[in-house]
Amino acid sequence: MKSIIIASLVALAIAASPALDRTFSPKSEYVYKFDGLLLSGLPTTFSDASQTLISCRTRLQAVDDRYIHLQLIDIQYSASHIPQSEQWPKIESLEQRELSDELKELLELPFRAQIRNGLVSEIQFSSEDAEWSKNAKRSILNLFSLRKSAPVDEMSQDQKDMESDKDSLFFNVHEKTMEGDCEVAYTIVQEGGKTIYTKSVNFDKCITRPETAYGLRFGSECKECEKEGQFVQPQTVYTYTFKNEKLQESEVNSIYTLNVNGQEVVKSETRAKVTFVEESKINREIKKVSGPKEEIVYSMENEKLIEQFYKQGDKAEVNPFKAIEIEQKVEQLEEIFRQIQEHEQNTPETVHLIARAVRMFRMCTIEELKKVHTTIYTKAEKKVQLVIETTLAVAGTKNTIQHLIHHFEKKSITPLRAAELLKSVQETLYPSEHIADLLIQLAQSPLSEKYEPLRQSAWLAAGSVVRGFASKTQDLPLIRPASRQTKEKYVRVFMQHFRNADSTYEKVLALKTLGNAGIDLSVYELVQLIQDPRQPLSIRTEAVDALRLLKDVMPRKIQKVLLPVYKNRQNKPELRMAALWRMMHTIPEEPVLAHIVSQMENESNQHVAAFTYNVLRQFSKSTNPCYQQLAVRCSKVLLFTRYQPQEQMLSTYSQLPLFNSEWLSGVQFDFATIFEKNAFLPKEVQASFETVFGGNWNKYFAQVGFSQQNFEQVILKTLEKLSLYGKQSDELRSRRVQSGIQMLQEIVKKMNIRPRVQQTDSQNAHAVFYLRYKEMDYIVLPIDMETIDNVVEKYVRNGEFDIKSLLTFLTNDSKFELHRALFFYEAERRIPTTIGMPLTISGKMPTILSINGKVSIELEKLGARLVLDIVPTVATTHVTEMRFWYPVIEQGVKSLQSARLHTPLRFESTVELKKNTLEITHKFVVPENKKTTVSVHTRPVAFIRVPKNQDSEYVEAEEKTISHSQYQMSTEEIDRQYETFGLRINAQGNVLSQWTLPMVLMTEQDFEFTLENKNRPVEFTARVTIGNLEKTDLSEIKFDKIFEKEFDLENNESENRRQYFHKMIREIQSEQGFKNLITLKLEAPQQMYWNTELRTVCDKWIRMCKVEMDARRSPIEHENKEWTLRTELLAARPQMPSSLRQLREQPHREVQLALNAKWGSSKKSEITFNAQLEQSTEQKKFLRNIEREYKGIPEYELLIKAARLNQVNVVSEYKLTPESEYTFSRIFDLIKAYNFWTVSEKRVQNEDRRVVLQLSVEPLSRQYMNMTIQTPEQEVELKNVRIPRVVLPTIARRAMFQQTWEKTGATCKVDQSEVSTFDNVIYRAPLTTCYSLVAKDCSEQPRFAVLAKKINKNSEELLVKVVRREEEIVVKKSDDKFLVKVDGKKVNPTELEQYNIEILGDNLIVIRLPHGEVRFDGYTVKTNMPSVASQNQLCGLCGNNDGERDNEFMTADNYETEDVEEFHRSYLLKNEECEVEKDRISEKKNYKNKWNREEKKSDYESSSDYESNYDEKETEKELVKKTLIKEFSNRVCFSIEPVSECRRGLESEKTSNKKIRFTCMPRHSKNARRFLKEAREQTVADLVDFPVSFVESVKIPTACVAY
């Protein structure tokens, strides 16, 4: 047994011996030839590429089993542009380049390495060696680093079995290579006497990888895109060949491709190999080096020094650009700006120079920047000065920003210009603590205190910079991330700014700064603000928005914070909606969404519920690849909800996603509005634009928003101030107002009404416009009372507008010159390569914009003239680049897309009021001897730049345009010239016939469009004249042939209808008419014109109109005569009934239209339309079936529906040219094809040149349409075509007002025993002979009150009193007539209009309020108010109209109660004029909250409530009225009248038969779903307006019994 153990230990020791795994024999010298190749070009073998070949001989001395010494000798390199090949290029095919002695000495310095188990574990370099030289030597050692066998403890059993078979082996192991510590896959293959080792690197499984990334912090995390869309894809494969246990050759091939939309567009490739030359004994030892021990992984020390210099400026320990002398930097910059000045117009070359200047400025110290300022800036012209300022801001290093701030403080740069430059600083590529401190100091400086735009920009920029180093982003800097102490420091600074703020705007600015920073530790401060009810609502909402950048960092934390905020009904609706909006962008899981849906279904605030539904629905339909999981989850939870939002809800959210799933690219437009019930303006409006490009998600690429709190107060107070200027009060009106106010105050005193005081005054009212760009708040524009007061005081003096000051401001001629250089984006990623050079992949879009011009305004007595003369010039280049860098060479490939625009413009606009007309003229002028140029150029370029021996001297790169030969063959030449309007237009270039984005990036294209005017100025004029209304005679309007046989009615009523119609026309023609003339003239050079005249003649009430339009234009193309158009339209509407009786008795209820049009040049086309807008047969049947006699409010509401016109009949006769007939035929075919599944047609023989159309809309749902078209040859029928819900016209009087109230208003109904409040809460409460307060403005300055009472105890009739600030109005109905008293005096019906009172029909009177109206029919009081009214300051039986159902019962002293009786009593006006009906108001059965479901349930189940001493009453209580439902497969039918049923727990004892009318509707319709849900809880009250579908006999109980 002992012998076995000893043998095992010996075997293990032998296996672990490095001698068996070593590559080199001790005390031996090996010589290897090293060859390295850099290749930059397109991913094809058919194009040229820039190639650099580096070669040397490597002396390698194996000192012992572990250490080797190395030295490079015979170093040389060559570089040229030659065709790509899979073979190594020959040295002769490349141009020999000279290597300086200094660089050669560095490369020849020796180095030492330790090898363990075949891998290079440690490296030592000479202390004199440079970092780039060390990395070059690492690339050679990298070729000698090889693991010949898998670690025994990491081998699987299969691998151990394979180990026994020496022919092949495969294993995975983590290993350090030049490119990082990553997983490596090994394959070992025996081929004869050779052993081939192959290893490949899996970059998806790296522990560490030396790489940097800048400029990516503005993107959001898109997990769905990360799976498929890798922008840069590296591949590295090593091959080692051994023969007789000696390394014969080692080769590595790395390919780095740039992918766009899943296709490779450019590539960089590195190849390196060492080849065995000879082996010998050591004759001349390589000097041993004793530098610090380092790893084989690529060293980023040089990149780290550069980053430190950019971020820390002169405080950095090492200046990596010290080798370049200050004079040489100044000379290069001087030459750059000299060339920019020489370019009168901006060109792509100008853009290239700006990019060079930015790169050079980043290398400068403070002293060097001062030198540039004194040498170049102070002596330059204005254009160069502006460009220098912007390039310094774009450079964004600590030194350039410090230099700019220095000149801000000296005011050599104006504060407004400084604020503009700080916008570029926000996007700096190298954010740091030093830069943030500079910006905070600037924001707190005395200069910023004086200039608010500068202070705002400094704070916002500070927040954006802090995010760059203190928050988790996609950037990968080398300097360690910010510590917790650093994060806490900036949170304290920003929160101190918040706490020191006095105004709401300053607090909002502080929170936007904190939001820009996106620090995770800020969440604790923000949560406190969100949850603190003492904070103003605007602050809490802004704190929610400040969480936006933490959605990827801590999504669950945000959900945990915001979900309770959303669900808490005590919070304001806009805060809850903002919380939901922010929470949805954290991509919540399904359980969170289930909470949201549950809250939506039980939500009492309809704005919150509707907004929630819209958000979920829009996300469920999103095609944005970053929202795919969320879309699935939202779709799933919406399947189980029955909630349907009301149509009139204004709070909403919508998306327009435009994405290509294959390319992982696209854009999305979002729009959201948040309204509150008691605000006229939206609380929040957002319109945003986000992009996904190749999987890179820019969530807030651009967003414009508006938010406000109580800003209506500011507007109203401002208007009130303006209305007082120059006005004298009317004494009589003043007395009337005082009288009305006194009556309102008496009501308040008698009822002990506590005023609903506004919680926030106008000082806290404010509004904010903001612009968000790349997730950063960019601009914040506050508007508050102080701002508006300053403007009003500036232009209003002594109660009158200061016209002179305004005119002086407007008429000043203003010359301006704007030059702005900017980078729309700049991103950079640097990764190591296996040849020791860093590969930089970058994208940027430098742009220069210049605008020179003049604007002037000339004011005349009755007119004004605006002249704008500008010359905008824009040049931009999009650069995508892959670049290798060595001190000896710079090589790479880039794809360039350049665009240029230069267009001189002159625009003149004149407005002039002449004797009887208003004339508006717009003139667009193309100046003479000026050229407009639009050019686009794309090309891929390979480049090589070899510095001269003097490192500092700039050498232009050797460039060669390359292209994909296959794609290039798809291009076509364009060379076209046009002559139009006296302008010469040239379009020439070389463009792809069919293209995709990858094709554009890989081909050379150019296109130029020029517009040149060498003659006199070319003017394009548009002139509009609008004439005054003039009196005229209506007898010229003739309705001769307006009726067609298809318009005849049933039951032989046509003749009677026609006589009635012509009589009505004659009566209208006897009245005074009015006419108007509008002309439009468009004029262009070369006698091109379009002239139009529009003449209208109508009566005073627009019952009958004649519209004529004549148009003429100059002939075009093949026309030889002037083209003309003449049309005449006649229209007549029927009388507007105000009652159902009038509607039934009115013979003519249709709208008649007649149109004649004639157009053409030599040949004329003519078409005649006669149309009739009428009621369909079903709609007329609905009117006839209304058996019950309705009066008052129910009658009028039914009249609106019964008077709808849902069908149009059109008869057309035509004489068309062949061309016009073909056009109409094609349109007709398109309609049939689009509705293929619902169309049927048959061949017929009808009258020639005559078409009949009938179109009817289903009047109930208004979402289905039938259409029949009869042509001379066919009859086409479309049935049940689904359309968006339409609003049908109705001829009922005041129908438009009624429909407006239904859509946008809130309504309250009160009768003698029941109230339906503004917020749709229905409860039972009795009216007595004492006045009850129905609705009142309960603010501190009340404007109206509505009261109602019973006329006497035994009557159902009511008496209504309306108190306005001007008068008191009392209305009652006596002998079917309304008796109206104003301030105690009876008013005749003819005088009602002057008191804003109107009688509709015989049974309805309307009293207008300051904001709203009261409708009264003698039995019911209906009060209509805007849905946003009185700022939650209404009170009375109708509730507070705040959108919440839970707080409806607020008593007169502003106390919330659940006792309906207590609530009712508080609004009872007791005085000596009435006797209180104590029995009636004390009886419990008269009170009931029908909306409260739990209360209803208890009512049904409690038997004690139904006990009575009278059998009749007991039977009545045993029975309940419910809507009977009959369900069928595709429809649901409801009983129109409620049917008696036994209460729960009781069974019927006696029954009787009764005929019940039913109305049916489609099962999927919205009404069906709503009524089904409502019928389970209560009687459906809205069914009386629906048509009768069938009548059926039903057994109903008459007595119930409990068993």
UniProtKB/Swiss-Prot annotation:
- The signal peptide, as residue positions, is 1-15
Q: Tell me, what's a Pfam family for it?
A: VWD
What GO cellular-component annotations does this UniProt entry give?
extracellular region
Q: Does the keyword Transmembrane helix apply?
A: no
- Phenotype on disruption: Simultaneous RNAi-mediated knockdown of vitellogenins vit-1, vit-2, vit-3, vit-4 and vit-5 increases life span, causes accumulation of neutral lipid and an increase in lgg-1 foci in the proximal intestine; however, does not affect fertility or pharyngeal pumping rates. Expression of transcription factors pha-4 and daf-16 are increased.
Q: Which residues form the VWFD domain?
A: 1306-1475
> Residues in domain Vitellogenin?
24-685
Extract the InterPro entries matched here.
Answer: Lipid_transp_b-sht_shell, Lipovitellin_superhlx_dom, Vitellinogen_b-sht_N, Vitellinogen_open_b-sht, Vitellogenin/Apolipophorin, Vitellogenin_N, VWF_type-D
Q: Which cysteines are joined by disulfide bonds?
A: 1308-1438, 1330-1474
Q: Hey, what tissues is this thing expressed in? A: Expressed in the intestine of adult hermaphrodites.
| Major location (coarse) | secreted
Glycosylation positions in this chain: 1266
Q: Does the keyword Secreted apply?
A: yes
Q: Its biological function?
A: Precursor of the egg-yolk proteins that are sources of nutrients during embryonic development. Together with other vitellogenins, may play a role in modulating life-span, acting via induction of autophagy and lysosomal lipolysis.
Name listed for the protein in its UniProt record: Vitellogenin-4
What organism is this sequence from? Answer: Caenorhabditis elegans
